[in-house]
């Protein structure tokens, strides 16, 4: 474990923020720097089949050290950080033996407070790694990367019994592109785990069904003084559309298994307005109903417009709930839960109110639930991770490998 923190601090020092709306994969040059570094480190560790694809996926094998028909399993993390907040010049703070109360983030007024984040009350005495209040930390998912790298080193050095272990590091997870170019056949694992979760004990195999909704509104602009019966205000139409969307089914009013509509962006003028929604729901039927609802709203608001004015709606599915694929292979979850219990961790099965590469991979033939990393408050300046949580994640990865070797 001695290099776990060192690895993590090195990885977060590299700016690997991904960028939406870019055709190339990886979407940013910074990701290539970390991917090349990981490839080099894996080669130096003496692992085999180390590859880096032209789409930025690193794959590697730790060969089995025991004989028998043992299934090959995989562990996967992503190297990019969220576009939502700066990941440049990350300056981590290490708070040893946290004693409670507010933690100052840098020299400004920003604090990490248990009033806003009550989970801190559960972390007394632990070592917290925080931001300086100016950037995100990048624990999502460089904690996962560091944990997998450390687990590989532990498995190799301590000669713990295991079958073939396949590992992959992917780009552009935060913008939904990482798994699209993942070669499941080349990866060659029977199942895998993404290491991309939150607090210790989290084990996730349910995620949202997700879709994006883009609405283009074309109006007609004339001088306001002579506008009667002629002007069609695209902004007013946008406001009417949003007024029809259920206000009590938004991200800020929902939790657990509840789905939502989220107006993520809106811009425009009288002539033209654009709206971008995301739709999320765990239930497939409710998911389809939400998409129909958006189409009905657009049709209702657009009824009777002048032929030159119109509302155009495009819905695109992003990913689906991996539950239907993972539950077909219950042993995958059984092994992960047993590994946690063996490490004195109580498994916390909860739905992901989001998505992971594992969701897409599960529908590509690689069942892939999600393991915890020990991190919290992702995508912002209040992000932090505990060193103890990271160490627990390493222990669980190693134990999963060991338990799988007994499955022959």
Swiss-Prot record:
Q: Cofactor: bound how, per the entry note?
A: Binds 2 Zn(2+) ions per subunit.
Identify which top EC class this enzyme belongs to. hydrolase
Has the keyword Protease been applied to this entry?
yes
- Active site (UniProt): 80, 173 (proton acceptor)
For this protein, the record's InterPro entries field holds: ArgE/DapE_CS, Bact_exopeptidase_dim_dom, Peptidase_M20, Peptidase_M20_dimer, Peptidase_M20B
Q: Which reaction does it catalyse?
A: Release of the N-terminal residue from a tripeptide
GO terms of molecular function = metallopeptidase activity; tripeptide aminopeptidase activity; zinc ion binding
Residues annotated as binding Zn(2+) 1: 78, 140, 196
Q: Which residues form a coiled coil?
A: none
Record CDD domains: M20_peptT (cd03892)
| Cofactor dependency | Zn(2+)
What is one Gene Ontology biological process annotated in the Swiss-Prot or TrEMBL record?
peptide catabolic process
Q: Which residues are listed for Zn(2+) 2 binding in this entry?
A: 140, 174, 379
Q: What does this protein do?
A: Cleaves the N-terminal amino acid of tripeptides.
- Which protein is depicted? Peptidase T
Native species: Citrobacter koseri (strain ATCC BAA-895 / CDC 4225-83 / SGSC4696)
- Quick one: which gene encodes this? pepT
């Amino acid at each position: 474990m001695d290099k776990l923190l060192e690895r993590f601090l090195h990885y977060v020092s590299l700016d690997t923020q991904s960028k939406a709306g870019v055709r190339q994969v990886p979407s940013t040059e910074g990701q290539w720097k970390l991917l090349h570094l990981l490839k080099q480190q894996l080669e130096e560790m003496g692992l085999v089949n180390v590859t880096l694809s032209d789409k930025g996926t690193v794959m590697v094998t730790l060969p089995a050290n025991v004989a028998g028909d043992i299934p090959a399993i995989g562990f996967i993390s992503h190297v990019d950080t969220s576009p939502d907040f700066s990941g440049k010049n990350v300056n981590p703070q290490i708070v040893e033996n946290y004693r409670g109360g507010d933690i100052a983030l840098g020299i400004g007024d920003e604090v990490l407070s248990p009033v806003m984040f009550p989970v801190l009350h559960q972390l007394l005495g632990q070592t917290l790694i925080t931001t300086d209040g100016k950037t995100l930390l990048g624990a999502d998912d460089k904690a996962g990367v560091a944990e997998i790298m450390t687990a590989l080193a532990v498995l190799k050095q301590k000669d713990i019994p295991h079958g073939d272990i396949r590992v992959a590091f992917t780009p552009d997870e935060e913008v939904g592109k990482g798994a699209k170019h993942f070669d499941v056949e080349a990866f060659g694992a029977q199942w895998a785990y993404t290491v991309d979760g939150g607090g210790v004990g989290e084990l996730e195999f349910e995620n949202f069904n997700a879709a994006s909704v883009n609405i283009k509104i074309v109006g007609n602009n004339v001088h306001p003084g002579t506008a009667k019966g002629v002007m069609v205000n695209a902004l007013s139409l946008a406001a009417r559309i949003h007024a029809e969307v259920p206000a009590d089914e938004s991200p800020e009013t929902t939790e657990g298994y509840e789905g939502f509509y989220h107006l993520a962006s809106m811009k425009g003028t009288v002539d033209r307005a654009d709206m971008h929604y995301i739709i999320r729901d765990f239930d497939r039927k409710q998911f389809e109903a939400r998409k129909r609802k958006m189409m009905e709203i657009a049709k209702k608001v657009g009824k009777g417009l002048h032929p030159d004015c119109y509302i155009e709606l495009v819905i695109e599915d992003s990913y689906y709930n991996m539950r239907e694929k993972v539950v077909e292979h219950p042993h995958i979850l059984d092994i992960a839960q047993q590994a946690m219990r063996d490490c004195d961790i109580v498994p916390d099965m909860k739905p992901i109110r989001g998505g992971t590469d594992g969701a897409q991979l599960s529908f590509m033939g690689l069942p892939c639930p999600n393991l915890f990393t020990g991190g919290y408050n992702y995508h912002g300046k209040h992000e932090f991770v505990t060193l103890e949580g990271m160490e627990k994640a390493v222990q669980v990865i190693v134990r999963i490998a060991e338990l799988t070797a007994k499955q022959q």
